[in-house]
Amino acid sequence: METMDNERRISTGIDGLDKAIDFLRPGDTVVWQCEHISDYMYVATRFVTNVARQGNRIVYIRFADHEEIMDTAALRERGANVEKYELDPRVGFETFAVQVHRIIDKETLGTFFVFDCLSDLQKYWFSDLMISNFFLLINPFLIRRQAVAYQPIDYEKHTYETISRIRKETPLLANIRTLDGSVYIHAVKVRGRSTPTTYFPLKITGTRWRTLTSSADTYAIFERFTQTSERRDCWDSMFDSVSDGREPTDEDGQRLKENILRCLLGNEPTRLALCRKYFSMRDLLYIKNREIGTGCVGGKAAGMLLARNILRDEAPELYRTRIEPHDSYYIGADVFYTYGVQNGLWSSRIRMVEAADYLEYAEPIRELLLNGIFMPSIKEQFLSMLEYFGQSPIIVRSSSILEDGFGNAFAGKYESVFCPNQGSLKERYDVFERAVKQVYASTVNPDAIKYRAERKLLDRDEQMALLVMRVCGDVHGNYYYPHIAGVGHSKNLYLNKQNASAENKGMLRLVFGMGTRAVDREADDYARLLNMDNPTAPPMVAYGDEYKYSQHKMDAIGLKDNEFETIRVDGIDKRDLKADPSLFMEPDYPTVSRLREMGLSTADAPNILNFRKLLRSTDFTDVMTEVMRVLEEKYSYPVDIEYACNFDQDGNYRVNLLQCRPLQTRGVGAAGVMPNVKEFYFRTSGNFMGGNVCLPIRYAVMVQVEPYLDLPEQRKY
């Protein structure tokens, strides 16, 4: 096991500084606050020269655009034990941080590290918060490896909050400036030791140095160091120059818009190309103004916004008259990483990525995610958002960076959580915070981890943003729900000879109430399945069985008990629907006929949720067909949507488009190849039940159809 003398004195290469801070020690990470990289090079060069002369191992972490801090080739020629690692921050925060961590871990105990300016990472991540997150992740590893590290930041490019987070964690923090031909160094934090002159400024002119202790000298220097102007986060600064919402006309403006597109909506190439066409600068500013924290809003949010903008531009009349507006909020992906860093789950996350049995670390990470705390500034923004929504029910939806992309949908892998949003502001906040943590924790559920592992995505940047939406619906007694909701595919994967057509207009799954019963299919209940080539065609069930194979339960938000509930639809027509019940249901006529034949009252005959009048008497199916057609055409790919609708007493309605993503028609693995077989036992054609597999068959069992059908239900199974 490697050990070191933690009290070993290490020179900075500057005598006056060594005297002021009582030298460096193993585990000291020094953050240099400077205005110009040349100031940092002054101290870094002297530090490297000194430790190289003593034969110490030196590692240079190179990632910035500024000039190189040290000439590793020249040092190596002089016999120095030096290594340069060139990294690209464009790979994303998580991947970049893991790369740096691996370098630190690989190097021997007590290695000396020199970093480029951390502030340059803003060019790639556009987030002040992520700069401090990176430091807070890497700093403990450096200390644990008893390294000595130099890391510069440009003091003027960071908010006070970022500087405060770094100051709190670094062992040493010092300012360095060049003024009037002299170098001034001022240590503002030295952990674990002090001398009578530690916190006095040091003036270096040529080879001479002196400590400035007189009030006149220190006033003159501190007055020039002091900055009273408010420091803007680089994220806010990026948007300040386009605050008027005008479209850019010059090359610099176009480049800035491209950066904003990538920062807000992600780098997935196919979707990004569509976003360039359908998002104006005004659209991007609107998203930014409704974002909590900073960073990408994630794939689900981007897909929803893109679909709405496509319809706005390509089908303006439909959009104006039939699409319900939304007022969603977005919790930026940077908040997820900040939450993880603040609550100490990073080490476990890295071990999970690198472990052979990655599920071993999932549960400990999940517990940390469920029981962490948020920064006060984030909590304040959460509260402000909840005040905006009032007591309208909301849903916290996962919107990870990779989610709903082309090739990796992550469908159903991450959670979404409904918040009934009733009670006092504190009660609503507590429920909302638990919902956020629950979605965060779903990033390490076994299904999600296996999905990422199968697609070799475990080491990819997968930050979790959140989409917070007002639930589409209305209050009906003690419950809140929309009249109808469901999912749609622009291509119908459930075809047979009878419903096949050359056009293939797609399909819808349709339910009464919350759309969860259409998304999360229930074994004991049924959604209405519509072939959009012939949407009014009755379900393919035997006469008299329509009620049996119809919807019997609905999902709703219980306002009285403040929870998501599943209730029976019996008697729903007698409740205050605020719409014509016959749009959605009609009497079960076979049952009515039987009751009449028996001379019994038909008053208690059940209704069937078959949506017959809705499908025959409104333009709902035409609208949904057009929505899916336009989106598929502009995506150049079949799409999968989620929707909900509310009706009024006159039959007017609007569609709330909740989600849009490329339709996943293939799983992992190679496509099957149909064999050219001339001799066969049996074959069939013309029917396709959606999804297919190619499996070796050992046995074929022939069942006599008529005797089988004569069996009672229990014997059949």
Where are each of the predicted segments found?
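Substrate-engagement module of ASCE P-loop NTPases
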Residues: 124-125, 130-157
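A conserved helix-loop-beta module that forms one wall/lid of the active-site cleft
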Residues: 284-351, 355-376
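Conserved mixed alpha/beta core segments that line enzyme active sites in large multi-domain catalysts
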Residues: 156, 272, 278-318, 372-717
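Conserved inter-motif catalytic segment of the P-loop NTP-binding fold
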Residues: 54-123
